[in-house]
């Protein structure tokens, strides 16, 4: 059994349902300290975070390449629906099954072993390497990576390159990397009416009827054209609620929750302003609160993307695709202190599902891609 596979299995065996790390990071600290990493644990509201750095010969003058990952996993769902126990790593049909196998314990194991091999082969490596690991990525993500980034920013520390170990491969291992992500902004809209008997509408004011024209306009609105890296911005309703459950009462208010996934072609302020304009045009009496979960970020082609593309091609023979599709990731926080952030990891078809798995044959190539990137950029 390879060292990467063994470490992946050990990590899967720890039931680190968010935000519980289950001492996964303690295991990583043992491995990393043994090869010269300085390890710092940053805890916040029950969340465990790790910042581990191994300085190169050039010290702080050299480039720093970091790996970002998360030890927490999503809940398993009904355990009885799994073909094998979700926290007992199980081999079947050439696959390794277990919660976190693809998202993202194999990636963490791959980078740790890649680091061990890299340091052994290049004991005088010029650049520095680091790992930023959290147990709060699958949850609210308020006490995880963002807290480490806050601490690093306060100390004036930056990264030159960051590889996030998210499972980005789509159909074939290595076929896609993420060089950016859309921003995410949610709104909670409450439209006020006047409650009354449904037989006497002239004595009431139905907030659903008042809301409907504005809702139709928001649905039909063309927010932007996108750009060469991002698709057009989207607006979607996630929740719609009004009424008491009775059939003879006109409700007193209607509540809508919605979400923008937006590109660098739009801004938070611009989108918020346009929503308010549409609501105000309809003369609505409303309250609207906003939550910005993350801003869009983009890493144009450069040293990191070139190194990763070459590493993937040399290892797999695949010309990978740069993409910004999908949801948000912790890359949105890291982009504050790192100009080159790219995500790469295994196939994502089974993540968050019953019987999550990774192809065993992909585990060593994953580690090898990470090592090739280290060798190109900081050896």
From Swiss-Prot:
Protein's recorded name: Succinyl-diaminopimelate desuccinylase
Enzyme class name: hydrolase
Entry's cofactor comment: Binds 2 Zn(2+) or Co(2+) ions per subunit.
Co-factor requirement: Zn(2+); Co(2+)
Family designation: Belongs to the peptidase M20A family. DapE subfamily.
SUPFAM superfamilies on file: Bacterial exopeptidase dimerisation domain (SSF55031), Zn-dependent exopeptidases (SSF53187)
Binding site for Zn(2+) 2: 103, 138, 352
Sequence positions that bind Zn(2+) 1: 70, 103, 166
Superkingdom classification of source: Bacteria
Keywords: Amino-acid biosynthesis, Cobalt, Diaminopimelate biosynthesis, Hydrolase, Lysine biosynthesis, Metal-binding, Zinc
